[in-house]
């Protein structure tokens, strides 16, 4: 569909740079857009409210979708099965966003194949992932596997036992937190391997960018903190993203036959 250059919009000052990148790729477009792994709506509601895109959301987490439905009752959202096919027909969408989702799934190739199926010819995939770099060992999503007792202690101290149980003990939806059951490593990608993975599944990267270097040092404290301290730490993350490009990878890729 038609596209014009877009500014970062409502995410220009957001500490997570992936949203500004995705906004720039998508906000000037029209047609049907799917935010795959939309969560409870950090990105999709803004895109739905401020652009001409016909937005759809999909996620396997029922709690996230319930929160998103309350927030945007007019936004069509669908619950996915972790190990199932996408519940959409062939060439159903003109663009798909996959923002820090690919690293959570057990079979990346299968998911990319499904995205290729539901995108129309020449459709746009906007993809963000963590990039493998010097500080990848600090990835907090791997703490639950490497240090399970410490992870449980810290998480329950901050959010409570019930929230921990709902997020990590109950795997009835094939999820452990945001990670698919059967996946025991939050993948951090090298640029050549991600580009090759995309090309192997019918996507040609057009834009590759990145952000951050030291943000992992601030991310966990920011997740656990609140109020002014959290705002300060998120400001550090934002500034880190302004200066460095090594820790996250952002890709806009076209579907090819």
Where do the PLM segments sit?
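Conserved N-terminal segment of class I S-adenosyl-L-methionine
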Residues: 1-89, 95-97, 112, 179, ...
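S-adenosyl-L-methionine-dependent methyltransferase catalytic module, highlighting the catalytic core
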Residues: 7-14, 106-114, 124-252
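Alpha-helix N-cap/helix-start and coil->helix boundary motif
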Residues: 41, 62, 102, 132-134
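A short SAM/SAH-binding and catalytic strip from SAM-dependent methyltransferases
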Residues: 97-106
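Short, cationic motifs built from Arg/Lys/His that form the positively charged side of catalytic pockets
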Residues: 117-120
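C-terminal beta-strand of the catalytic ATP-binding
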Residues: 253-257
